[in-house]
């Protein structure tokens, strides 16, 4: 009985490992048709009796403003070009902060956010975190940094039912993602921690201040020229 259960669990684990590897490899080249977060938001809207129409249009790397690419890195993950999916010092700092109490601080890299939004559900359980770590490792192994950022920018939530850079640019500023200015890009990046609560087009004093900080960080990183470092600066 026990041996049968172990064999079945082992077989299920093997299928999961193989399936997840194949899925990550496919999305290395094929645009994901949607994300787990989009499904979650759609289901939540049905449960709440307020169905929403999801807005999302996939745009390739070259059709997204370099200003937005750098703004997102500046605001969310300044070590993106050099790490392998995990920012250990940031994780340690977040754990120490959370142990002291107060608002919970996260330390997710852009790669971890892609893994979570694309494949997993919301939550803070250790099981989900373990799956997130697994998918993060696979993404870093099989995708380029450019691809990771491209998928992130096409999957990030930027408002109620608004997903991806193109939908966000049209919704908040009435322009295409390729034509976003540095200020607009900074405001979009500023609301990423709480895109439902905060508005990029009608920024609160806090969001405006955060956008200003992001612009300064963009300049310190070197602006769009920073993108040349992607896939050439990773540290073992």
Curated annotation (Swiss-Prot):
Membrane-topology descriptor: Single-pass membrane protein
Chloroplast in keyword set: no
InterPro entries named in the record: Glyco_trans_51, Lysozyme-like_dom_sf, PBP_transglycosylase, Pep_trsgly
EC number(s) on file: 2.4.99.28
Record GO biological process: cell wall organization; peptidoglycan biosynthetic process; regulation of cell shape
Pfam families named among the record's database cross-references: Transgly
Keyword Kinase in annotation: no
GO molecular function, one term: pentosyltransferase activity
GO cellular component, one term: peptidoglycan-based cell wall
Family membership noted in the UniProt record: Belongs to the glycosyltransferase 51 family.
NCBIfam families linked: mono_pep_trsgly (TIGR02070)
Protein's name in the database: Biosynthetic peptidoglycan transglycosylase
Gene designation: mtgA
């Amino acid at each position: 009985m026990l041996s049968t259960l172990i064999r079945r669990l082992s077989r299920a684990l093997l299928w999961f490992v193989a399936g997840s590897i194949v899925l990550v490899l496919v999305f290395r080249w094929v645009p994901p048709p949607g994300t787990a977060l989009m499904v979650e938001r759609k289901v939540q809207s049905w449960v709440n009796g307020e169905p929403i129409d999801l807005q999302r249009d996939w745009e390739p790397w070259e059709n997204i403003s370099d200003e937005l690419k750098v703004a997102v890195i500046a605001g969310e993950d300044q070590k993106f070009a050099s790490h392998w999916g995990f920012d250990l010092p940031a994780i340690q700092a977040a754990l120490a902060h959370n142990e002291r109490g107060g608002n919970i601080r996260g330390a997710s890299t852009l790669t971890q956010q892609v893994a979570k939004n694309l494949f997993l559900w919301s939550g803070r359980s250790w099981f989900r975190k373990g799956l997130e770590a697994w998918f993060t490792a696979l993404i870093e192994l099989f995708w380029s940094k450019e691809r990771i950022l491209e998928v992130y920018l096409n999957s990030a939530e930027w408002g109620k039912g608004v997903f991806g850079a193109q939908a966000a640019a049209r919704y908040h500023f009435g322009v295409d993602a390729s034509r976003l200015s540095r200020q607009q890009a900074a405001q979009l990046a500023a609301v990423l921690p709480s895109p439902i609560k905060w508005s990029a087009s009608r920024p609160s004093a806090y969001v405006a201040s955060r956008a200003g900080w992001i612009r300064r960080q963009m300049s310190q990183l070197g602006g769009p020229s920073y993108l040349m470092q992607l896939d050439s600066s990773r540290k073992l």
